[in-house]
Amino acid sequence: TLINIRDTEEFVVNIVSEEFVEEMVACSTDFDSDVDEFEISGLTAAASQKITPPRVEKAKVSYECTLNQIIEIGDGKAGSGCVVIGTIVLFHIDDNIYDNGRILLNKLQPVGRIAGNEYTRLTNNFEIIRKIKPDK
């Protein structure tokens, strides 16, 4: 993925939902840059509108992005990596998870990778009211 981002200066961020987490894991290996991860995972590509790389059809939220910079962190040993910073040029939101200006997280059911083989899901949400402007 990183090689392709460097080469094209474009990328898509797809928010992974529980319904296709297994397919996502199937393509989360360090494949050579010429390997078609859609073919490996069984996911279907959907054409992007503003950039060349496709997005994941099943993704309920996708961001089409252009590259701003890549920041390398570490010395190349275990724990090192890169932070990719981009500009969102278009985002796609499934109408079924969007209501009155808000994304409905219970319908999106996003999954996040913590580290290694550990993942997390939103299951026990709670709300904390914060002040807009602190009192002095």
Task: Report residues per predicted region.
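Basic, polyanion-binding surface patches
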Residues: 1-136
